[in-house]
Amino acid sequence: MAVSSNGYRLAKHLSAWQTAGLNQLNISIDSFDPTIFKQITGFDILPTLLQDIDTLLATTDIKLKLNGILMADTAFDNLQSVLGFVKNRPVTYRFIEFMQTSDNKALFFAQHSSGQLIKDFLLENGWQSQRRASDAGPAIEYRHADYVGGIGLIEPYAPQFCDSCNRLRVSSQGKVHLCLFDNGSYDVRGFLANGDVDGLVHALQSLMPIKPEHHLLKQNDSGIMANLSMIGG
């Protein structure tokens, strides 16, 4: 079981999450600079969050992944901070290319940066890409013999990014999205509310033939998703 979180109350919830069977945690950290972190999140909690992360790593077997949006203004500085952070920690930090949605077009065109910059740096400095498992997510992960942790890249604008997509998204309203950027959603709330596993499986299987082959981000079509926080991705 995996949870995505901003880590704001990590210490408070960690014990309960362990009891519930949590085995993977994804936390968003878009900057390791406390000032920039506060500007982005509105909370001056980065030192506490990093301390809580170290406690999690020292006291649990939970697999931890950190995510950050790749922004043009901070890309290189953030990469240097990430390299220091994963040096001795069993953590994968994933850079995610900034994706356009209907509410961020101006910021997107000002700050979008290709993941190729990160990839080139890693390959030039002895990092090696890892083979993806068939059930893995969209990140390409890189490892280095001198580092305990790893660095990942999620590049939705890269060619063939959608070819191996194995993801469905379910919103808190019980709507299935076959793609983060599609133009429709499908209601499965009744199956979830009633614990109807067979009905849910049948419904999901019936949707597979119409799952889009690819998104249309390069055509500036981000679908119905006004903001990625609506779906948690």
Locate the predicted segments by residue.
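Radical SAM/AdoMet-radical enzyme domain recognition
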Residues: 1-94
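Auxiliary Fe-S-binding modules of radical SAM enzymes
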Residues: 84-88, 98-233
